[in-house]
Amino acid sequence: MPIDAWVREEVEIPEGVEVTVENNVVKVKGPKGELERELKYPGVKIFTEDGKVVVYKEFPRKKDIAIARTFKAHINNMIKGVTEGFTYKLKVVYSHFPVTVKVQGDEVIIENFLGEKNPRRAKILPGVTVKVRGQEITVEGIDKEKVGQTAANIEQATRITKWDRRVFQDGIYIVEKAGKPIKF
C-alpha cells in the first residue's frame, strides 16, 4: 500500500561538473574524467533541473523508495569520482617468505607468496591504476565499483584456505577504503 504520493531525491551538481540524462543513462563529466551509467527501474524518472539531478517516482512502495535512494547514492558516487576520485590502500604482510608485488599490464603479479614457485595474479579493471611502493599498494580511479573490485581481486589472490588464519596471517589486506581506515 503506498504511503506517500511520491518520492523525490535530489543531488546537487557542484561547479565544474556537467551532468546529462538521456533515456535513463546518466553521464557525469568532471575534472578527473567522465562516467556513464544506466539507472533503469520501472516508473523511476531521472532528470536535471535548477542545478540538481532529481530521482522521482509517483506512488512509491517500499522497494521503490529504496531504489530511488540507491540511484541517488550512485549519482553521488559518480560526482565524487569525477571530482576527487577514489583511493584504496592495501598492505603486504608476510612473516617468513618475502613477497614481491609488481604491476604488469592489466595484472598484479604476486611472487613468492608462502614460498610458492608459481606467481599469483590479480586482474586490474579498466580505468584503474595500481601503484606499488615497498609494502604498500595504492589503487586509484574515478569509478568506485571498479576501484573496490580491483582492491578485492588483489586481496582475494592471496587468500589462504585450509590453514588457520589466526596463525598464518600472510597476505595482502585492504587497510583503507575510499579514504576511510578499516577497523580490524
Swiss-Prot record:
UniProt keyword Cell membrane, yes or no: no
UniProt keyword list: Ribonucleoprotein, Ribosomal protein, RNA-binding, rRNA-binding
A single GO cellular-component term on record: cytosolic large ribosomal subunit
Classification via InterPro entries: Ribosomal_uL6-like (IPR000702), Ribosomal_uL6-like_a/b-dom_sf (IPR036789), Ribosomal_uL6_a/b-dom (IPR020040), Ribosomal_uL6_arc (IPR019907), Ribosomal_uL6_CS2 (IPR002359)
Annotated GO MF terms: rRNA binding; structural constituent of ribosome
Pfam name, any one: Ribosomal_L6
Record bears the keyword Ubl conjugation: no
Function: This protein binds to the 23S rRNA, and is important in its secondary structure. It is located near the subunit interface in the base of the L7/L12 stalk, and near the tRNA binding site of the peptidyltransferase center.
Xref: NCBIfam families: PRK05518.1, uL6_arch
Similarity comment: family membership: Belongs to the universal ribosomal protein uL6 family.
The protein, known as: Large ribosomal subunit protein uL6
Naturally occurring in which organism (per UniProt): Thermococcus gammatolerans (strain DSM 15229 / JCM 11827 / EJ3)
